[in-house]
Amino acid sequence: MMQDVSSSPVSPADDSLSNSEEEPDRQQPQSGKRGGRKRRSSRRSAGGGAGPGGAAGGGVGGGDEPGSPAQGKRGKKSAGCGGGGGSAGGGGGSSSGGGSPQSYEELQTQRVMANVRERQRTQSLNEAFAALRKIIPTLPSDKLSKIQTLKLAARYIDFLYQVLQSDELDSKMASCSYVAHERLSYAFSVWRMEGAWSMSASH
């Protein structure tokens, strides 16, 4: 009987079962090796993240990765705002610093020139009125303004015209200009005292 059992051939089904049982045993050590490699690689990557780069990223970004798009946009916006404000401030400083002194100097020059022209005009006008007052016969009590002086000059011209039209002056008065001027001045003063000046001033 023992010989029959030992010499009995092994069926193919038994061989396939034994082979299938051995294959999982072989695959289990291989999968264990692969799992160990994956764990080691994950530990290395975690250690690299916790290194200087990871610490810097966590401290600066507050949990965001250093190369994340959100952090890049924030950095660009802050840099753009800062640069724009600086350029605007620089431009305003240059415009205010370069434009205001020139405009102030121009205004000052225009004011000085206007004051000079006004002084010259006033001086020439005063000189003309002083010369006119010397020609027109005036009373000692006269304190005439410029308008009153012009009115008196107009009345004096009218008086001279009336004198020339009359035949009261003789040849002696005409020959002596000084006497004629004195008499004309006296006559004009009398004419003023009679009320003709008040009538002319009212007109």
UniProtKB/Swiss-Prot annotation:
Q: What does this protein do?
A: Acts as a transcriptional regulator. Inhibits myogenesis by sequestrating E proteins, inhibiting trans-activation by MEF2, and inhibiting DNA-binding by MYOD1 through physical interaction. This interaction probably involves the basic domains of both proteins. Also represses expression of pro-inflammatory cytokines such as TNFA and IL1B. Regulates cranial suture patterning and fusion. Activates transcription as a heterodimer with E proteins. Regulates gene expression differentially, depending on dimer composition.
UniProt cross-references to CDD domains, sorted A to Z: bHLH_TS_TWIST1
Q: Which species expresses this protein natively?
A: Saguinus oedipus
SS bond list: none
**Comp. bias (Low complexity):** 1-18
Q: Where is the composition biased (Basic residues)?
A: 34-43
Where would one find the signal peptide in this protein?
A: none
Tell me the segments the record calls region Sufficient for transactivation activity: 162-192
- Compartments, as annotated in UniProt: Nucleus
GO cellular component terms, semicolon-separated? nucleus
- Annotated PROSITE patterns: BHLH
Supply the alphabetized keyword list: Activator, Biological rhythms, Developmental protein, Differentiation, DNA-binding, Myogenesis, Nucleus, Repressor, Transcription, Transcription regulation
Compositional bias, Gly residues, is annotated for 46-65, 80-100
Q: Which InterPro entries match?
A: bHLH_dom, E-box_TF_Regulators, HLH_DNA-bd_sf, TWIST1_bHLH
Q: What is this protein called?
A: Twist-related protein 1
Subunit structure as annotated in this protein's UniProt entry: Efficient DNA binding requires dimerization with another bHLH protein. Homodimer or heterodimer with E proteins such as TCF3. ID1 binds preferentially to TCF3 but does not interact efficiently with TWIST1 so ID1 levels control the amount of TCF3 available to dimerize with TWIST and thus determine the type of dimer formed.
Molecular function terms, GO-annotated: DNA-binding transcription factor activity, RNA polymerase II-specific; protein dimerization activity; RNA polymerase II transcription regulatory region sequence-specific DNA binding
What region holds the bHLH domain? 109-160
Where are the annotated segments for Disordered? 1-106
For the biological process aspect of GO, one term held by this record is:
negative regulation of DNA-templated transcription
